[in-house]
Amino acid sequence: MIDIQLLRKDIETVAARLAGRKFQLDVNTFNALEAERKQIQSGTEELQNRRNTLSKQIGALKGKGEDTSAVMAEVAGIGDELKASAARLDVLQAEISKFMLAIPNLPHESVPVGKDEEDNVELRKVGTPRAFDFEVRDHVDIGAALGLDFDVAAKITGSRFSVMKGGIARLHRALAQFMLDTHTEEHGYTECYTPYIVNADSLQGTGQLPKFEADLFAVKKGGQEGEGEALYLIPTAEVPLTNIVRDEILAADALPVRMTAHSPCFRSEAGSYGRDTRGMIRQHQFDKVEMVQVVHPEKSYEALDEMCGHAENILKKLGLPYRVITLCTGDMGFGASKTYDLEVWLPAQNTYREISSVSNCEAFQARRMQARFRNAQGKPELTHTLNGSGLAVGRTLVAVLENYQQADGSVIIPEVLHPYMGGLTRLLPQA
């Protein structure tokens, strides 16, 4: 969450910056909560001072052998008032915390102001889309003859799932292995294996809760009627990776922390009804290789550009045309201060589609998680956190199928993946 001191010092400026994100800050509610908090805290201090004064009087009266009952009765009454004030203050603090958790991150000054994706700014294009001398097919038609099956998945589970068999399943696995190897061997990340089920504290730490619970899949021990705390399937490995440093104080020389993980991701896709209903572009379950960095605050924007380059390197090695865009204020994710999207060329759609999103969250997540490091003065200071897809495996598979398709229905496997394919250099349609 953002620093509450910013609201206390200049709430109107904060409200104006958030308006660029299409978020209306309820200034009146915050001011009312703060006014009552100050009033109670001031009253509490007065009561405590009065109690201290009376306690001294009791001592003096006892020393003189005089009656202390009236003064002691007043002290007892003050104790009751203090308990009531403390209880009300706890309620207020909870309301203020709830208020703060609902506020998105402040956009960095370099982020273009805009309403939606139409106002995003293209930074660069890399690679030239291939010219085909035959009718281009989409990944659904190509994949149907290669072992990609949505009907069986619908029978097993429902819509927005897929089954892969044979060579295409191996290609999917090869992509994930290639991404992990590149990030660990070339980019300096530590590979991690993390839980695919997390608790509410973890999701609150990275910003999915409480605001976006409808986007999640909830699970319980013992089935739907089971007992115990609410647990959730991860929407991205960003959640468990980033929460590794929750409630930790790192040594300054331990920064940056670079972590990567391959995991399935589970999303309800609330609000996306009717969008991308065909194929693998938008599914309830998909694989992704995630990158996370925990860095010194002064180096987070350097790290953002670095991470964008790491994601780009995967696309370059695969020979896939892509572009990089800077998201405008109105199109950024809840926790991001600045985001670059990488979009890969999909011939069948004749357009670029998102395949990676790389974001600097500054101290937004760290403040929620209390992820800190010891600064040069030895004092705990909030880290900055960054995350990015490196890449979405399913969408990368889609891009490979469409960009490397052949007229006979086969798909040439990018050379960089050959070591992972057991000698296969081309996927052939199954009889």
Curated annotation (Swiss-Prot):
GO terms for cellular component: cytoplasm. Keywords: Aminoacyl-tRNA synthetase, ATP-binding, Cytoplasm, Ligase, Nucleotide-binding, Protein biosynthesis. It catalyses: tRNA(Ser) + L-serine + ATP = L-seryl-tRNA(Ser) + AMP + diphosphate + H(+); tRNA(Sec) + L-serine + ATP = L-seryl-tRNA(Sec) + AMP + diphosphate + H(+). Pathway: Aminoacyl-tRNA biosynthesis; selenocysteinyl-tRNA(Sec) biosynthesis; L-seryl-tRNA(Sec) from L-serine and tRNA(Sec): step 1/1. GO terms for biological process: selenocysteine biosynthetic process; seryl-tRNA aminoacylation. GO terms for molecular function: ATP binding; serine-tRNA ligase activity. It is an enzyme of class 6 (ligase). Its main location: cytoplasm. The keyword Cytoplasm applies. It is found in: Cytoplasm. L-serine binds at T236, A237, E238, E290, S389. ATP binds at R267, S268, E269, E354, I355, S356, S357. Catalyzes the attachment of serine to tRNA(Ser). Is also able to aminoacylate tRNA(Sec) with serine, to form the misacylated tRNA L-seryl-tRNA(Sec), which will be further converted into selenocysteinyl-tRNA(Sec). Belongs to the class-II aminoacyl-tRNA synthetase family. Type-1 seryl-tRNA synthetase subfamily. PANTHER family: SERINE--TRNA LIGASE (PTHR43697:SF1), SERYL-TRNA SYNTHETASE (PTHR43697). HAMAP family: Ser_tRNA_synth_type1. Homodimer. The tRNA molecule binds across the dimer. Consists of two distinct domains, a catalytic core and a N-terminal extension that is involved in tRNA binding. This is Serine--tRNA ligase. It comes from Herminiimonas arsenicoxydans. The gene is serS.
